Amino acid sequence: MKDLLLCIARSLVEHPDDVTVTEVQGTDELTLELRVNPDDMGKVIGRQGRIIKEVRILMRAVAQRKGRRVSVEVVD
């Protein structure tokens, strides 16, 4: 799932080499921390948060098919 988020995020930004994803395993949920270049933050979040919302929905759907729970956090 980390690779999927990395691929999606890199396709959205102008500085794909600056994109990193860190997995943080909680007790019952996997948190994926997404870090991007500060210049690309707006592109990842989108107007009124629409893009990151859709990315989160997609990641939850993939996780649900695997019987897992996941959350995506954008870290600056």
What are these regions (language model features)?
Residues M1-K43, I51-D76:
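RNA-contacting regions in translation and RNA-metabolism proteins
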